[in-house]
Amino acid sequence: MITIYTSKGIKHKVQSVIKTHGTNNVYEICDIQKIYILKNDLGQANGLLQHDKATDQYLIHINENLQHQQFVIAHELGHYFLHKRLNTFKVVNCSKVLKDKLEHQASLFASELILTDKMLNEALPYIQGFSKEQIAAYFNVPSFVTDYKLSQIGSFSNRIYSHEISAFG
């Protein structure tokens, strides 16, 4: 069975991962999960999650030439925590739509993991008035991560910290 997560479901999954592991640091999470990170020249690919059935070991391969390797590792962790029971290579007639949905979910997971709401709230005094690009640079994340996070914050009109939302507008 394929589980299609909502954005809210992904956020809750990330919060659970952070609580369980005591960190949002992708390297520490990989260490705790015994997931090895291998850096190689992957050509056009940014990264991939591999499972070795013989040893029941997971590996994350990342392209050594990438600027935002942390995001790619977080993306692959998204596949691990959201989709590890689903092997799209074995799903008969796996459509491009399904593949795109799974990739989108992994990217949302990565965005929530490397730029948490708590991080944004704590940095508010420093980043107030910053553009999305400046916020991305402040946290050293790709700009699409801040685009996603700020759109999510803006969508919660009944949020407790409503005064903080206006600062991200």
UniProtKB/Swiss-Prot annotation:
Quaternary organization: Interacts with ImmR.
Say which species the protein is native to. Answer: Bacillus subtilis (strain 168)
Q: Which keywords does this Swiss-Prot/TrEMBL entry list?
A: Hydrolase, Metal-binding, Metalloprotease, Protease, Zinc
Listed binding positions for Zn(2+) are: 75, 79
Coiled-coil intervals: none
UniProt xrefs under InterPro entries: IrrE_HExxH
What this protein is called in its record is: Metallopeptidase ImmA
The record's function comment reads:
Involved in the regulation of horizontal gene transfer through the integrative and conjugative element ICEBs1. Required for degradation of the ICEBs1 repressor protein ImmR/YdcN.
- GO-annotated biological processes: proteolysis
Highest taxon, organism lineage: Bacteria
Kindly identify the residues recorded as the active site: 76
The entry lists its GO molecular-function terms as: metal ion binding; metallopeptidase activity
Q: Which Pfam families does the protein's record reference?
A: Peptidase_M78
Q: What is its EC number?
A: 3.4.-.-
